[in-house]
Every structure is written in structure tokens, then in C-alpha cells.
Amino acid sequence: MNRTVNGSGMKRMALLNDLSCFGKCSLSVAMPILSACGVETVPLPTAILSTHTADGFGDYVMRDMTDEMEAFAAHWKRLGIRFDGVCTGFFGSVSQLSFARQFLRDFADPSTLVVVDPVLGDNGALYGCFTDEFVTAMRALCADAQFITPNRTEAALLAGCRIDAPVEELLEKLPVPNVIITGVHRGEEIGYCARLNGVWMEIFKPCLPGTLHGTGDVFVSALCGELMAGRAAAEALPRAADFCDRCVRATAARGEAHWYGLAFEDVLKEEREQ
């Protein structure tokens, strides 16, 4: 029997990111959210971790997946698998970033949605595991994307600006068609500042106390779901921001016991029951 791996009619998205087995971030967030959006997900783990890396878990176990990534992609290429979208997150080395660019050359075409969440740093500093060479390589990957979703620190690193540069300057200097800067604080609010095909947009929500892990991953996953459904960027952004805000509030309702990630399952369950 001849079988085809393409043509089912369901949108398919490759997810290049780490898998943290406990805790909610990266692939463990992206796969269920995108599946709920009707998108077929194909994960390609860049690393596998016992937990995510937040304080509270102690010494986590991590395995690099570079060799497996290359072998998996080679198999997919032999099968002729195509993707309607590619979303990338954490990479552990410059060689993995080079692989990601080759992956796009092998599996993407001009119609493929490419979203890069450029994991580099936070709170004004580059993560200690990364170098200036890594930032340069990430900048090159971002140039291949239609959308990037850096936080303010990552936007400054990519733009080559000082960390406290105005958001407007960062948006102006990042040469990607659609840039969404996440986690922007304004008084008692937190939100997103974006340049979407030359149009500026901002969305802010009341900021709740405390630190929540995986918020950016939930937002990016929801954004990809909206974009894969064919919604324009100016419609997809507020819808994804609203979903993320609902997840934050659902998590707050669960209290300290759910400190390790967003309770996005509660929101997906609510939507299913409506």
C-alpha cells in the first residue's frame, strides 16, 4: 500500500525546542496548546531535561540531543515530510542554531510560517551558558523568520542596543517583518509591544504579584495556533495575549502549590466545555 505523509489537510508544525519532563515550559506546553488549536505537532527536542531550570528543583539532569536532531531530520527528509509552520525555542549551542537554519532550508518554503522565540537571557543579562558568538548565530536565525518573540533583554541583545534602550528603538532596529517584545512592564501592567508589518501595536494587562514560569512559552504557543489558523498578526496577537492572561489568572487561583508553571490545562478545559 502506498502511503503519503503529506496532504491530510491538517496544518503541521515542527517544534524545535527542549523537553523539560516535569514543569511546564517549551515542548510540554507547545504540544497540547497547538493540538487543541487543531495543529499537528512534530517535536524535535534540542535537549531533554528532568525538570525545567527554575529555582526550586535543585540539580536537574540534562541530555543534549544534537546528534539525534540531525538523524531525525535526515529520516524526515527521506520521507519527504513537509511543514506548514516551524517554531523554534531553546538551543544549546551554535551548532544547533546552524542546524536550525539548515532545517529551514530543507523543510520550509516561502509559504511556511517561521516563528523564532530567541532564548538568550532575561532580567537585563545574557544567560551564563551563552556567548557573544551564540547571540550572533541567533541573530542569523531570526533573519530567517517572519515572527520573533523576544523579551526585552533578548530584543536588546539582538538589536545590539543597551539593555535599557526604549522599546520603540528596539522594535525599529530589529529587521524582522513581525517583532513582538514580551514581558514589557508599564506601571502596574505587563504586556507586549509589537511592530507587525510596519504597524505598531501594544497590549497590556494588570500585573499579578509573584513570578510565573513558562508564561512566554504559553503565549508563543497560542500565537502560533492563531497564526496557523490563518488569522492576521493584528488579530492573532490580542487573542494569544488574552489566552495567556487567562492562564495566568487560572494559575493564581490555584495558589502556591502550582508555582512551577501555568495552569493552561484549566483554560483549555473551560474552552472545551463551553
Identify the residue ranges that each predicted region occupies.
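Conserved N-terminal subdomain of the carbohydrate kinase-like
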Residues: N2-V116, L120-G128, E265-E273
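Short pre-catalytic strand/loop immediately N-terminal to key active-site residues, enriched for Gly-Thr
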Residues: C21, W200-G214
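Phosphate- and divalent-cation-binding pockets in alpha/beta enzyme and binding domains
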Residues: S95, F99, L157-L158, A222
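Conserved phosphate/ATP/ADP-binding segment of small-molecule kinases
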Residues: L126-M201, G210, R231-A234
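Short, small-residue alpha-helix embedded
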Residues: P209-A233, L237-R239
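Charged C-terminal helix
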Residues: A234-Q274
